[in-house]
UniProtKB/Swiss-Prot annotation:
A divalent metal cation 1 binds at D73, H88, H150, D154. Residues 287-305 form a propeptide. It comes from Arabidopsis thaliana. The gene is ENDO1. Optimum pH is 8 with RNA, ssDNA and dsDNA as substrates. This is Endonuclease 1. Coiled coil: none annotated. A divalent metal cation 3 binds at W29, H34, D154. GO terms for molecular function: double-stranded DNA endonuclease activity; endonuclease activity; metal ion binding; nucleic acid binding; RNA endonuclease activity; RNA endonuclease activity, producing 5'-phosphomonoesters; single-stranded DNA endodeoxyribonuclease activity; T/G mismatch-specific endonuclease activity. GO terms for biological process: DNA catabolic process; floral organ senescence; leaf senescence. It comes from the Eukaryota.
Length: 305
């Protein structure tokens, strides 16, 4: 799989931003979900890793990782990046409610490692070699950073590790309050957008502030050590995927039938799960970046650019 993870030029990266608002929603957290995950992660970076991340980002985003966290969704259908379209999710056997890497991490042709878990492993491995690259290293590592940041959001969205037959809920059509949607989109965006509208006056900054307060001294403070426990950076995404399929079974699929209307009861009971997974994605992304960019080689890589 590593040979497939190719690099691009700055031009391609810029063009990805230009089409940011023109691509329809696909299998991924909403724009807001990814922005929150990346903002939370960047705010938890130590000084050295934060400097490396800022150095890898193109100048026009002014050091803001969240400005590019949706980029992998925007380019997934381009010919050059079509191979990445299967890296955003994992299809598991219907009703198994479990995840096994050897069984489930492959694309529709059976090519191994082509899933969001395999992608996180690959891009983490690339970033671990940041201080050892050639003169064009910056472009390779920029893409690796953006893909890793995005996929860490995706793997924490429970319906991204869903059942094969319904494509993670994409084919379960229903209504969200008064408009048409599907179960996957409910978890990708509907719950987040409803929370923003009803609780935060559509202000993403207020929602972010609320989430971060619960990290520092609130609801999740005592959970941080267990969330970031990881003896092997390459293997830890297995755990994140397993968490997601269990949540998909318990909270996503449970009690839902095609054609029905989901509204207040579903929103109120599932909102805490969605918020927690967004935060876990950010906390764990920060953990990975702090570890891969913490050594002298990584800092030397910044000085060399």
């Amino acid at each position: 799989m590593a040979s497939a993870f190719r690099s691009s030029t700055r031009l391609i990266l810029v063009l990805g931003i230009l089409i940011l608002c023109s691509v329809s929603s696909v299998r991924s957290w909403s724009k807001e979900g990814h922005i929150l995950t990346c903002r939370i992660a960047q705010n938890l970076l130590e000084a050295g890793p934060a400097h490396v991340v800022e150095n890898l980002l193109p100048d026009y985003v002014k050091g803001d990782l969240s400005a590019l966290c949706v980029w992998p969704d925007q380019i997934r259908h381009w010919y050059k990046y079509r191979w990445t379209s299967h890296l955003h999710y994992i299809d598991t056997p219907d009703q198994a409610c479990s995840y096994e890497y050897s069984r489930d991490c492959h694309d529709q042709h059976g090519l191994k490692d082509m899933c969001v878990d395999g992608a996180i492993q690959n891009f983490t491995s690339q970033l671990q070699h940041y201080g050892e690259g050639t003169s064009d290293r910056r472009y390779n590592m920029t893409e690796a950073l953006l893909f890793l940041s995005h996929f860490m959001g995706d793997i924490h969205q429970p319906m991204h590790v869903g059942f094969t037959s319904d494509e993670g809920g994409n084919t379960i059509d229903l209504r969200w309050y008064k408009h048409k949607s599907n179960l996957h989109h409910v978890w990708d965006r509907e719950i987040i957008l409803t929370a923003l509208k009803e609780n935060y006056d559509k202000n993403l900054d207020l929602l972010q502030e609320d989430l971060e307060k619960n990290i520092t001294n609130g609801l999740w403070h005592d959970d941080l050590s267990s969330w970031t426990e990881c003896n092997d950076l390459i293997a830890c995404p297995h755990k994140y995927a397993s968490e997601s399929i269990k949540l998909a079974c318990k909270w996503g699929y449970k009690g839902v039938k095609s054609g029905e209307t989901l509204s207040e009861e579903y929103f109120n009971t599932r909102l805490p799960i969605v918020m927690k997974r967004i935060v876990q994605g950010g906390v764990r992304l920060a953990m990975i970046l702090n570890r891969v960019f913490s050594d002298d080689h990584a800092i030397a890589g910044v000085a060399a650019t």
